[in-house]
Each structure stands twice: as C-alpha cells, then as structure tokens.
Amino acid sequence: MTTADNARILRAEEVTGLVAEIPEGHRHLRTTLTLADGTSLTLQESTIAAIVRAYTAVKTSPVTTRVVMRGRRMAERKPGYAEWQLLEE
C-alpha cells in the first residue's frame, strides 16, 4: 500500500478478494474488500453508491475531472435511506 500526504492508495494487486452481499437479516448491501496483508474493509451500501455516483460523473463527462462529496446528516430523507449521506458539494 502506498501513501501520499497521509492518504492510502490501494493498488489493484493489493486487493485479493471482494464480496458484495446483503447479510441475513439486513436490507442493504455490504461490500468487503480483502487485502493481501490479511485485513479487510467493509463498506456500507450508501458509501458504495456515492463512489459509483462520483465514478460515473467523472467517467461519462467530457469536462468533469473531479467530484467532491462531503458527509452530512440528513434530517429529511427517503424511507430506508441512511441519516448520514455523502453528497456532492
């Protein structure tokens, strides 16, 4: 794993496995990355959705090269949505 200014960058070869599933008794997707050093990182559906939105915005736009999202607590939200959301600035 490389670092730059306190940021961790995972190289593709450092991710040895990925499991995306809706655990028993839950309603939302969880995605677990397994790393070469044996550690794992589990992301909730709302985090993956934010990553997908940002990725899609950058990859499909001829002019957008960056998307910035910040976490916010949402007092009003759709049923089933998390109170904490990553939203575009």
Could you say what each language-model-derived stretch is?
Residues 28-30, 64, 81:
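Broad gene-expression machinery/nucleic-acid interaction feature
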Residues 35-74:
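Acidic, aromatic-enriched beta-alpha/helix-loop junctions
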Residues 23, 35-37, 78:
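Acidic surface patches and DE-rich sequence motifs
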Residues 1-2, 40-41, 87:
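Short, compositionally biased strand/turn segments
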Residues 1-9:
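Short aromatic-glycine motifs in intrinsically disordered, low-complexity regions
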Residues 70-89:
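Polar/charged, Gly/Pro-rich intrinsically disordered segments
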Residues 12-21:
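Phosphoinositide-dependent membrane-docking surfaces
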